[in-house]
């Protein structure tokens, strides 16, 4: 139900019924073509985040935050350590007509989300970054996630699935779902019984 278009193209008539995401990725990661990004978009499309508050860690171009909002999320808190990604996310947010109170963007990491979210609890964490970075910030997920909240991890290689399971299980996380595309994997976690 999602169509990702470069900002400068018109929507082809046969796709007018889809949710359109306009992007000008610049130099930030996230055009929608990478398998890890596609896995995340498919996960959001299959289980829309209606009314949820989202954290997008390593937001890149903002594509996952924008997708979540297009699919009914209440708001997003997006962070990246790259200032070019922050600029790209702000530009793409404006291209898709989202105000700053819907798509909140911060330079930094999980600490900025913790410091800036009014409800103090995120419903869904999107984390499409490489496995070593996921492991470095993973222990902080429970500081921002609410009861029954979920985490969608992507950006990991298929051969890293077991390593990440072994990392998160002792922290109290349970694996709800694993999907793969090419050599890339997506893992959905939560803190409660499925």
Question: Which residues does each predicted region cover?
Answer:
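Structural signal for conserved beta-strand scaffold positions within catalytic alpha/beta enzyme cores
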Residues: 4-6, 22, 56, 107, ...
